[in-house]
Amino acid sequence: RGEKLVTNPAESSQTAPDRGHIYTCGYSSASMRIMASRTSEVHAKFLLPYLRPGMRLLDCGCGPGSITVGLANTVAPGEAMGIDIAPVQLDLARAHAAEKAVTNVQFEVGDICDLPFPDSAFDAVFGHTILMQFQDPHPALAEVHRVLKPGGLVGFREPIFSNNLAEPPGSAQDQLWKLFGRVLAYNGGDIDMGRRL
């Protein structure tokens, strides 16, 4: 298929060819545990004061649904919809919602750049570390705008990893963040997307 395994992204082009969506964090058990530990109270705290009961909310790139389920509780009796490109994530999300007995939430396969919803379908759209997967977030944001009701609410939480402080410089943690940034850039993402919003 013309694909090449790159073990050292520093030796390759920093511009990724168009290979479709590549989720740099991957789906290892460690990565999935980290994603499942996220909560709306911490990771969507900035958005919570603006949400109201009865809203219809979309969570783009919902992963295992831990944030989505919390947002569903906030907008109840409204609805929350979580989308992700990885069915394995959605299986975990559905199980999490069932475990928490949250019934006003649904999960389905979806791509933020081609949302499977009609125009003006949501009162609010949220995303956590999803726009960082793209060098150009405009196609994703255009889709968000399309499915958002007039006057709707948009909230994305994106990183600015260049502001991370790892001491001492050159430590394993410092090297890890730099490597992650190079791999993310190679895969078509931007480790400092938060700076661009």
Label for each model-derived stretch:
Residues 19, 56-60, 64-114, 139:
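Class I SAM-dependent methyltransferase SAM/SAH-binding core
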Residues 138-153:
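A short glycine-rich, Lys/Arg-flanked "PGG" loop and its adjoining helix->strand segment in the class I
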Residues 113-124:
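A short acidic, Gly/Pro-enriched loop at the edge of an enzyme's catalytic core
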Residues 123-138:
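A short SAM/SAH-binding and catalytic strip from SAM-dependent methyltransferases
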Residues 37-55, 70, 74:
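Conserved alpha-helix/loop element of class I SAM-dependent methyltransferases that forms part
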Residues 16-39:
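Class I SAM-dependent methyltransferase Rossmann-like catalytic core
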Residues 155-197:
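Conserved catalytic/acceptor-binding region of the Class I
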